[in-house]
Amino acid sequence: MVREEVAVSTRTLQWKCVESRTDSKRLSYGRFILSPLMKGQADMIGIAMRRALLGEIEGTCITRAKSDKIPHEYSTIVGIEESVHQILMNLKEIVLRSNLYGTCDASIFVRGPRCVTAQDIISPPSVKMVDTTQHIASLTEPIDLCIGLQIERDRGYRMKTPNNDQDGSYPIPIEAVSMPVRNANHSIHSYGNGNEKQEILFLEIWTNGSLTPKEALHEASHNLIDLFIPFLHGEEEDINLEDSLNRGTLPFFTFQDKLANLRKNKKAIALECIFIDQSELPPRTYNCLKRSNIHTLLDLLSNSQEDLMRIEHLRIEDVKRILDILQKHFTIDLPKNKF
């Protein structure tokens, strides 16, 4: 467990992790502070961060299971202690950590008698089991258990939606709960007198082990920033709200629009304020960059072409696409290597 004393800054806004501990493989805790804040700001930030932590962070989970021996969810299989429904509930609880984009396939192939755990799941290298001891089923007889699984990265809660495969079979859907953050709370400490009264925001985060509390805080912060980016340049647009409302939708400010407006008004482009997920990069490319801590244009320009080629899962055509975008919108060429 890591614990630090709380030192309140009287000048610039700062945040710090004051406590960090791992209670188990599937439970991590972190306590953070942000200060100094003006009266009312701590509650505003705390509420927004809590909602972003609980609802805006992506998680990875098993969403479907398929086996020739399983006719439907409420059946039983001779030689297996648990019912099919219990096995599905156990699969639902498996905690996964991944840099996956979209879906992938996994499988279980075991022969009894033995206990089946998360360690028996055969998955791509991009998917890791957080706790390999998580129980799935108990085989009491020398039978084969073969289950095909679908793993998906998403956010929030998804109801079961039955759907047949191309081969005509019917995989059993699993209610997916893609929520890495188990709980989040905030509290406020006020100090000072009169007009000089200030606040400290305390933020507590519990995760399921697929993310550390610090990683969850970082991702939630970026998700909130992304939501507010269109408003940063809203005053530069001549928007007829009445016409827009009659059409039923408001104008969408694209990456190209914002750059054009900045150039038109002769404003310096704040590279650190332009996030790569606002560009026209494909989601898979964006996720590769994000996993390498490249979140803004400034982060991207700190790398050479060779650096990008070394990023895991980033293909040469992805690098060419990035270079084309930099040249097209910024007339910038990344150096081939760092000197």
UniProtKB/Swiss-Prot annotation:
Q: What is known of its domains?
A: The N-terminal domain is essential for RNAP assembly and basal transcription, whereas the C-terminal domain is involved in interaction with transcriptional regulators and with upstream promoter elements.
Q: Which HAMAP family match?
A: RNApol_bact_RpoA (MF_00059)
GO molecular function annotations of the record: DNA binding; DNA-directed RNA polymerase activity; protein dimerization activity
Residues of the region (Alpha C-terminal domain (alpha-CTD)) are 267-339
User: Which species is listed as the source?
Assistant: Drimys granadensis
One annotated GO biological process = DNA-templated transcription
From the UniProt entry, list the residue stretches annotated as the region Alpha N-terminal domain (alpha-NTD). 1-235
The record's subcellular locations are:
Plastid, Chloroplast
Kindly give the InterPro entries that the UniProt entry links to this protein: DNA-dir_RNA_pol_insert (IPR011262), DNA-dir_RNA_pol_RpoA/D/Rpb3 (IPR011263), DNA-dir_RpoA (IPR011773), RBP11-like (IPR036603), RNAP_asu_C (IPR011260), RNApol_insert_sf (IPR036643)
Q: Which UniProt keywords apply?
A: Chloroplast, DNA-directed RNA polymerase, Nucleotidyltransferase, Plastid, Transcription, Transferase
Subunit annotation = In plastids the minimal PEP RNA polymerase catalytic core is composed of four subunits: alpha, beta, beta', and beta''. When a (nuclear-encoded) sigma factor is associated with the core the holoenzyme is formed, which can initiate transcription.
Name the record gives this protein: DNA-directed RNA polymerase subunit alpha
Q: Which domain of life is it from?
A: Eukaryota
